[in-house]
Amino acid sequence: MPKVKRYKYKNIAAALAILLLIILGISTSCSSKADSPKKISASSSNSSAVKADSSSKKAVKKLTGNYMYVTAKNKTDMVNGDLILVNGDHSFTGTVNNTDTVYSYLFDKNGSQIMSTSSTQLTAKKETFEAFGKMGNDFYADKKISTLMINTAMPAEDDEDSSSACYEHDTGLAFDLHLYDSSTGAYPEFTGEGDYSWISENCWKYGLILRYPEDKADITGVSPMAYHFRYVGIPHAEIMTANKLCLEEYIDFVKDYTFEKPLTFTAFDDTEYSVYYVAADKGSTTNVPVPLDDNNNERPNTISGNNVDGYIVCVNMTENAAPADSSSQTDQQA
């Protein structure tokens, strides 16, 4: 955190003018906070995330206090998780659990259908559809447009060709959007333009990213797809969006951060996170360090394989956050 310089003013009027400018600056910052992801400088390795008005926030606790190890099985755990990279060089060999069908996510809180689907039996991981449903509800609340249609998710078990156009659909973490105009019966393409630009501009708030942006085709190896969205989770989607990183770039970006020197980040909802990378050991397992709180409880965290060479850990460092559910971890060491 930069040192705060202190100045003495001989002229009281000058001091009041400076104070007024500061107040106006803070007011402007607060008014735009909810709509803008907070940027992190990708060039400053192991540095703290840039925070709006950081002087008023408590410092994120360091991770070098009490901690424990979670034992990850490299053969299975490294190829599963919300942040797995699936592309032409890294195929999906993991498993998909906790799935759901799309139908119940097409309605608002009053039970009115506000979105449509190409099939009520479309299937994906539950967290993917939960993010889609929340985003769709907020889009409808803001734009009063009910033409969004989810067109593709996981391929059917007996359809060998349904995922050939995109590497990611097998993971249960991706879906494609289309449009359906019930008044005309037309099915326009989802281009993400006009009112629909709201989707790509706000999807990060729900843990979603536009997976194949127009300016990243040389990195992803896939032509731009304005309709294809991928669930990566919170706060990863916000970090990626703020720094204009596609998933390939984010996988490399996180490798600059370790358990000893993590990326610390305050999300748009003021939740404090620490994110770091753990390289997979050469053996069959990897001991992944995760921090404990002051009561020696495991802090809420997620551990995702990257499907390349290791694990990405995200820890909720906010005070009074609910402890992690240790029963979900298969093998732990104190």
Regions found by a protein language model. Give the residues of each.
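N-terminal Sec-pathway targeting helices
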Residues: K3-A17
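Bacterial N-terminal signal peptides
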Residues: A17-G25
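C-terminal motif of bacterial Sec signal peptides marking the signal peptidase cleavage site
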Residues: S27-S29
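Extracytoplasmic cell-surface/polysaccharide-interacting catalytic and binding patches
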Residues: S31-A42, N46-A334
